Curated annotation (Swiss-Prot):
Additional remarks: The substitution of an Ala for a Cys in the active site may be responsible for the lack of transglutaminase activity of band 4.2.
Any single Gene Ontology cellular-component annotation: membrane
Residues the record lists as Phosphoserine modifications: S248
Stored InterPro entries: Ig-like_fold, Ig_E-set, Papain-like_cys_pep_sf, Transglutaminase, Transglutaminase-like, Transglutaminase-like_sf, Transglutaminase_animal, Transglutaminase_AS
Keyword line: Cell membrane, Cell shape, Cytoplasm, Cytoskeleton, Erythrocyte maturation, Lipoprotein, Membrane, Myristate, Phosphoprotein
Similarity section: Belongs to the transglutaminase superfamily. Transglutaminase family.
Xref: PROSITE patterns: TRANSGLUTAMINASES
Positions of the UniProt region annotated as Band 3 binding: 31-39
Organism: Mus musculus
Protein name per its UniProtKB record: Protein 4.2
A Gene Ontology molecular function term of the record: protein-glutamine gamma-glutamyltransferase activity
Length: 691
C-alpha cells in the first residue's frame, strides 16, 4: 500500500449496536439498525494515523444501497468523519482515537431508505475501502420516524412480539389460533427485502406507506399464484401435513423460494399473517384483525344478495357479493403526510385486482378512520371496506319453477364483531368501535346518510336498506342455535313461530344444515328436515330439535363451519320467513400443564392430557410439540388410537435455551380432525435466578 492511509479492519460491534437498536433477536453477528439512531464502529488502521495528517482531513464514509446507488435518489450518501455530527442527515463523528484506532459514531437520517447497505471508507476523495454491510430498518422508537409509536407496550407487541393469535370461528364462538409470526427468524429479513426488491422504486423505500403497499401487493400476487384450489387439497389429503398452519415463515419461504409449506384455498386467510410478519420485520408496527360476518365482493354496494332453495340450503352466490364467516386483514401503524390531518394511525392494507397502475395500483392503504367516517373519496378502496362492515343482506328463495321470491329475513347485519389480540396479553380485544359508530347512534345515522348522498352523486346508489317485504298477513319466526357443535356430537336448534293474527295458519317449516368454508363458499349440503303443522290464532309455538353429526349425509370437510337455516311459509302467501346461524365445529379439549417459570438450560417437563368425548375412535393420533427457544426442532410422536370415553396422558421433556417469555404449542392430529392446538407460555430466566 506504500505510504497511503489504509484500513486493516472495521469492527461493527454488531452485538452491542443491535442491542441498542432492538434488533438483537434478528442477529448478533450482522449489523442491523433502525434509522434515525446512531451506532458505533471502530476503524483499525494499518499504520499510525499521525503520519497521514493531510489525508485525514479528507476521510469520509460512503453508505449505499440498491443496484445503482445514487445521491439523487437517496440511495447513496458520502459524509465526512468529523468531530461534530449532524443529527438530521448521514453523519459521522470521532468519539475516541489513538494512534491506529478510531471509534466513530455514525448517525443515519430518520427518513433514510431502508434495505441492505454497504459501508465504505473514502480517503482523499478517491481511494475506497469496503468496511462491511449492514441493514437499515424503520424505527418505531424514534419520535421523528413516520412509524413512531408512543407506547412502549405497543412497540413490544406490534414490532417485537413473534408470538400472536389469529381469531377464527364465528362471531358467537371466536376460536383463537396460536400463530408464530417469526419475524426475526434468521432468513426472514433477507426474504422480506427480497420481496421488496421486486419493486424497483428504491428511492421510495424511505416511505413506510409505499413499502407497506408494495408488500401487500406482492404478497397478494404470490398468494394468487401459490394458493392451491380445494380440489387439489382433497386429492392430496393423505399427503404430508396438509393443513398445517402454524406460522408465517414456512409460507413465506414457499412463496418466495418454493421451499416451505403450501397454502390451500380453505386457508388463504393466512396471507394477512404473512404480511404482518414482513411488516414487523421491516420495522412497521402491524397486527392481524379479524372481521366476523364480513361482506366481500360488494364493489361498494351496501346490499348483499344470498340465494337459498326451498330446502333452506344455499344455492349459489349473489351478484352483489356474499358474506364471509370471517375475513382477516392486516393493519399497520404510521403517519400519513400524504393525506389530510387526522388520518394517521392504523391503516388497512387492502390488496385488490391490478388496475394497470403498477404494483401500487394493486394495493391500497386505507386509514381505519376513513372507513368509520365513510370518506368514500379518500381512496378507491374505502367504499368496499365501508360496505364490508356496514352492508345489509337480502335473502332470496329460489323456487322450483325458477322464480325468485324475497324472504322476510331477520339476517344479522355484518361487521358487528371485529377482533384482534390485546396488547401484552393473550386475550381477544373487540375493536369494532374503531370501524363504525354504535348501532342506532346519531353518528352512525349521519355517516350512513353521507355515504348515501355520495353514492347518489356518483350514480352508484342501489339503496342502502333491504327492500321491505312485510306481509299483510304476517308470521313471525325466531331462530336459535348453539354457537358451536361438538365434532361427532349434537347441537341444539329451536324455532319459535308466532301467529299474530286471528286466523289459523298452515305452516311449512324446513330446517337445513350445510358445511361452508370461511369465505362463504359452500362445501357440502348435510341435512334437512321438513315439518307441516297448523298454527292457531295468536299462538306461539316453540319447536326444538337436535342437530346430530350422525344424521349428516357426509362428514363436514376440515376447516369448515356449519350454517343452519330455517325457512317457514304458510298457505295464504308465497312469502317465506327466513333465519340462519353459523356454528363452529368444536374439537376435544387439550389440557397442557407446565410451570409458568423455568430456568435456562435446565430440563422442563410438560404434561398433555386429552379425553375422547366423541362417539367414534380417534385413530392414528399424532402429537407435535414445538416452540422457539424451547425446542430445537419440532418433535412428533405417534400415539395410536384413542377410543370413545378413554383419555390420553403423556409427558415430554425439553431444555429451554432462550431467555424471556416463550410459547410452547402442542398439536394433535388424527383421522377425525387436524390442528387441535393448545399452548402455554413460560418465562425462561437465567439459571442463577430462583425458579
Amino acid at each position: 500500500m506504500g505510504q497511503a492511509l489504509s484500513i486493516k479492519s472495521c469492527d461493527f460491534h454488531a452485538a452491542e449496536n443491535n442491542e441498542e437498536h432492538y434488533t438483537k433477536a434478528i442477529s448478533s453477528q450482522h449489523l442491523t439498525l433502525r434509522r434515525g439512531q446512531s451506532f458505533t464502529i471502530t476503524l483499525n488502521f494499518r499504520a499510525p494515523t499521525h503520519t497521514f495528517l493531510s489525508a485525514l482531513k479528507k476521510v469520509a464514509l460512503i453508505a449505499q444501497t440498491g443496484e445503482q446507488p445514487s445521491k439523487i435518489n437517496k440511495t447513496q450518501a458520502i459524509f465526512p468523519i468529523s468531530s461534530l455530527g449532524d443529527q438530521k442527515g448521514w453523519s459521522a463523528a470521532v468519539e475516541e482515537r489513538d494512534a491506529q484506532h478510531w471509534t466513530v459514531s455514525v448517525t443515519t437520517p430518520v427518513d433514510a431508505v431502508i434495505g441492505h447497505y454497504s459501508l465504505l471508507l473514502q480517503v482523499s476523495g478517491k481511494k475506497q475501502y469496503p468496511l462491511g454491510q449492514f441493514t437499515l430498518l424503520f424505527n418505531p422508537w424514534n419520535r421523528d420516524d413516520a412509524v413512531f409509536l408512543q407506547n412502549e407496550a405497543e412497540r413490544t407487541e406490534y414490532v417485537l412480539n413473534q408470538n400472536g393469535f389469529i381469531y377464527l370461528g364465528t362471531a358467537d364462538c371466536i376460536q383463537e389460533e396460536p400463530w408464530d409470526f417469526g419475524q426475526f427468524e434468521k432468513d426472514v429479513m433477507d426474504l422480506s427485502l427480497k420481496l421488496l426488491s421486486m419493486d424497483k422504486q428504491v428511492k421510495d423505500w424511505n416511505q413506510p406507506a409505499h413499502v407497506a403497499r408494495v408488500v401487500g401487493a406482492l404478497l397478494h400476487a404470490l398468494k394468487k399464484k401459490s394458493v392451491l384450489p380445494i380440489s387439489q387439497t382433497q386429492a392430496a389429503q393423505e399427503g404430508a401435513l396438509l393443513y398445517k398452519r402454524r406460522g408465517s415463515v414456512p409460507i413465506l419461504r414457499q412463496w418466495l423460494t418454493g421451499q416451505g409449506r403450501a397454502v390451500y384455498e380453505t386457508q388463504a386467510w393466512v396471507s394477512a399473517a404473512v404480511a404482518c410478519t414482513v411488516l414487523r420485520c421491516l420495522g412497521i408496527p402491524a397486527r392481524v384483525v379479524t372481521t366476523f360476518d364480513s361482506a366481500q365482493g360488494t364493489v361498494g354496494s351496501l346490499l348483499v344478495d344470498e340465494y337459498y332453495n326451498e330446502e333452506g340450503l344455499q344455492n349459489g352466490e349473489g351478484q352483489r357479493g356474499h358474506i364471509w364467516v370471517f375475513q382477516t386483514s392486516v393493519e399497520c401503524w404510521m403517519n400519513r403526510p400524504d393525506l389530510s390531518q387526522g388520518y394517521g394511525g392504523w391503516q388497512i392494507l387492502h390488496p385488490r385486482a391490478p388496475n394497470g397502475a403498477g404494483v401500487l395500483g394493486s394495493c391500497s392503504l386505507v386509514p381505519v378512520r376513513a372507513v368509520k367516517e365513510g370518506e368514500l373519496q379518500l381512496d378507491p378502496a374505502v367504499p368496499e371496506l365501508f360496505a364490508a362492515v356496514n352492508a345489509s343482506c337480502v335473502v332470496w328463495k329460489c323456487c322450483e319453477d325458477g322464480k325468485l321470491e324475497l324472504t322476510n329475513s331477520n339476517r344479522k347485519d355484518v361487521g358487528n364483531c371485529i377482533s384482534t389480540k390485546v396488547v401484552g396479553s393473550d386475550r381477544c380485544e373487540d375493536i369494532t368501535q374503531n370501524y363504525k359508530y354504535p348501532a342506532g347512534s346519531l353518528q352512525e345515522k349521519e355517516v350512513l346518510e353521507k355515504v348515501q348522498k355520495e353514492r347518489l352523486k356518483l350514480g352508484k346508489d342501489n339503496g342502502m336498506c333491504p327492500p321491505s317485504c312485510e306481509p299483510w298477513d304476517p308470521l313471525h319466526m325466531f331462530f336459535e342455535a348453539s354457537s358451536s357443535i361438538p365434532l361427532s356430537g349434537d347441537g341444539q336448534l329451536s324455532v319459535t313461530l308466532i301467529n299474530p293474527t286471528d286466523e289459523e295458519k298452515k305452516v311449512h317449516l324446513v330446517i337445513g344444515a350445510q358445511a361452508l368454508y370461511y369465505n362463504g363458499v359452500l362445501a357440502a349440503g348435510l341435512w334437512s328436515k321438513k315439518q307441516l303443522f297448523m298454527l292457531k290464532p295468536n299462538q306461539v309455538m316453540r319447536l326444538s330439535t337436535n342437530l346430530s353429526f350422525s344424521c349428516f349425509e357426509q362428514t363436514p370437510p376440515e376447516n369448515s363451519f356449519l350454517r343452519v337455516t330455517a325457512m317457514a311459509r304458510y298457505s295464504h302467501t308465497s312469502l317465506s320467513c327466513f333465519a340462519q346461524e353459523n356454528m363452529a365445529i368444536g374439537k376435544p379439549d387439550l389440557i397442557i400443564e407446565m410451570p409458568k417459570r423455568a430456568a435456562q438450560y435446565r430440563p422442563l417437563t410438560v404434561s398433555v392430557r386429552m379425553h375422547n368425548s366423541l362417539e367414534a375412535p380417534m385413530q392414528n393420533c399424532i402429537i407435535s410439540i414445538f416452540g422457539r427457544g424451547l425446542i430445537h426442532r419440532e418433535k412428533r410422536y405417534g400415539l395410536g388410537s384413542l377410543w370413545p370415553g378413554s383419555s390420553l396422558h403423556t409427558q415430554f421433556q425439553f431444555t429451554p435455551t432462550h431467555l424471556g417469555l416463550q410459547r410452547l404449542t402442542v398439536e394433535v392430529d388424527c383421522d377425525m380432525f387436524q390442528n387441535l392446538t393448545g399452548y402455554r407460555s413460560v418465562l425462561v430466566v437465567a439459571p442463577e435466578v430462583s425458579v
